[in-house]
UniProtKB/Swiss-Prot annotation:
Subcellular location: Mitochondrion inner membrane
Catalytic activity: 4 Fe(II)-[cytochrome c] + O2 + 8 H(+)(in) = 4 Fe(III)-[cytochrome c] + 2 H2O + 4 H(+)(out)
Record protein name field: Cytochrome c oxidase subunit 2
Coiled-coil region(s): none
Entry binding sites for Cu cation A1: 161, 196, 200, 207
Amino acid sequence: MAYPFQLGFQDATSPIMEELLHFHDHALMIVFLISSLVLYLISVMLTTSLTHTSTMDAQEVETIWTILPAMILIMIALPSLRILYMMDEINNPYLTVKTMGHQWYWSYEYTDYEDMSFDSYMVPTQDLKPGELRLLEVDNRVVLPMELTIRMLISSEDVLHSWAVPSLGLKTDAIPGRLNQTTLLSTRPGLYYGQCSEICGSNHSFMPIVLELVPLKYFEKWSSSML
């Protein structure tokens, strides 16, 4: 869950988000080292007298600044590709949930059940209960079992939307006429908040997403009560 004046990422709640955080730290360290080297070279140039001003060719230097950037790019690309393949992999999902974006709410359908669907609207500020979050609470939460692979099918009824839950490392575009898919797996129970992340009209800011991840036995009780 985000908090005021937060500088870093939200706590990771899925294996994918943990991998993304590790990759962020990996890439940030490379950027830090390159920036330090560039600043060092600039400071050396500014504080020393120029020498070898007549040099026209330096094969060793050209070889280094060709090979070194290539190696750095490979160090960034390989873990990035690994995470991309992990995000695209779907193995025997326990549950499939179809998500449709509308102006300006979400609708959900549990396709493994015969008649289990609902709309999810933002709770107006005047209707909030003590402890609830402004602009993030919904009237119907998406209840899902934790520690199980869930497949999300995402599309839109009208304009472009984007279904995003940062703590789970999820952000998938909802495109009219196209069905995108992603997977989620939560490592611990809790409430996880997200929002539409694609500008979709005047009420774009009022399309929150709330996932309630619970143990399997509680999910089964909830699903039985919804049927």
